[in-house]
């Protein structure tokens, strides 16, 4: 059917499809968040190697980064941690998605190291950066940084990431310089 449409109609159909996918993603995120907050979903942390999880996330975002002219690097690690694979993937994917979305040129690095009683996963970018005054607010539900409001999004990705990671006994920190980029450090119990 679509092949019989005039070019302008096909463009409209494509635009409608893209918007419906964004709406579906938003609804899906809100449902996940609600279920997590209301205890309907429980996390099941297991002691697991991080490399396969990080490799999957890097592969998921590699094409999107390349389309934007970005380099995405995953540094090999032999670190293990205690986490729920499905939900930690969701949390880290939200952070990597933001890194790709808010980086216009440069690189995104994903690495993991041992840090005291935690495995620390660093996701660093050369993107827009976040002002010091906003760094404490970015994990608030629906908060959007002033310098990225023209980008698509509703401000629940980092909130959801923090909820997941804290539910696993971990935490997230951010270090950022406006115009230089950000490093999100995710700490998971070993």
Annotated model-derived regions:
Residues 169-171:
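Conserved glycine-rich
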């Amino acid at each position: 059917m679509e092949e019989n449409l005039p070019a302008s109609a096909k463009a409209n159909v494509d635009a409608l499809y893209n918007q419906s996918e964004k709406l579906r993603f938003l609804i899906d995120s809100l449902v996940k968040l609600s279920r997590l907050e209301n205890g309907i979903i429980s996390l099941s942390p297991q002691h697991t190697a991080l490399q396969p999880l990080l490799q999957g996330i890097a592969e998921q975002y590699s094409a999107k980064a390349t389309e934007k002219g970005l380099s995405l690097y995953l540094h090999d690690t032999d670190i293990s941690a205690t986490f729920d694979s499905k939900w930690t993937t969701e949390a880290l994917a939200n952070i990597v998605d933001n890194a790709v979305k808010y980086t216009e040129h440069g690189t995104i690095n994903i690495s993991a190291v041992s840090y005291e009683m935690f495995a620390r996963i660093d996701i660093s970018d050369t993107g827009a950066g976040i002002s010091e005054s906003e760094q404490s607010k970015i994990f608030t539900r629906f908060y959007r940084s002033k310098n990225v409001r023209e980008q698509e999004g509703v401000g629940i990705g980092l909130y959801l990431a923090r909820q997941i990671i804290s539910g696993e006994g971990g935490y997230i920190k951010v270090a950022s310089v406006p115009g230089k980029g950000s490093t999100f450090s995710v700490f998971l119990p070993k």
